[in-house]
Amino acid sequence: MLEKLIERVLFATRWLLAPLCIAMSLVLVVLGYVFMKELWHMLSHLDTISETDLVLSALGLVDLLFMAGLVLMVLLASYESFVSKLDKVDASEITWLKHTDFNALKLKVSLSIVAISAIFLLKRYMSLEDVLSSIPKDTPLSHNPIFWQVVIHLVFVCSALLAAVTNNIAFSQNNKGH
């Protein structure tokens, strides 16, 4: 009897995630606002914007779009996995969600982080002259911000690759056992 009560209480605690999911949807609203603000800024300066600034603005929009997709993916998968199944009119709307387990979600998040990091590095590359001109010539490599950004990006890439390899090994071993 006590065991059943404890299990019911523990299972009911999954609903504590629901307000967090709702709060994360507000993050999407904020990202949408920032996206539209950046788009408006780009469009309102279209006749005076340089090609480099146009590319940087476009990369910024792509970055925001990736981030919004990442937030939405984690939000929906978390709700579906831990809180409750999503009841919807058209089941084809989010068929990918039914095939997204925790490991697949981890890989998608890892790859999204790598993509966001790559876009950030590309934006830095586009303004490389400005960054390098602000660094004294005799500055050691360990004090160069671009060096550390590349190192961090490589850590993200290695982490994503390691997660993919680990997931692949685990998946192939699970298939052999069944």
UniProtKB/Swiss-Prot annotation:
Top-level taxonomic group: Bacteria
HAMAP family: UPF0114
Keywords of this entry: Cell membrane, Membrane, Transmembrane, Transmembrane helix
The UniProt record lists the keyword Transmembrane: yes
Location in or out of the cell: Cell membrane
Protein name: UPF0114 protein HPSH_00970
Main localization of the protein described in the UniProt heading: membrane
Pfam families: UPF0114
Protein family according to the UniProt entry: Belongs to the UPF0114 family.
Membrane-spanning segments: 15-35, 54-74, 102-122, 145-165
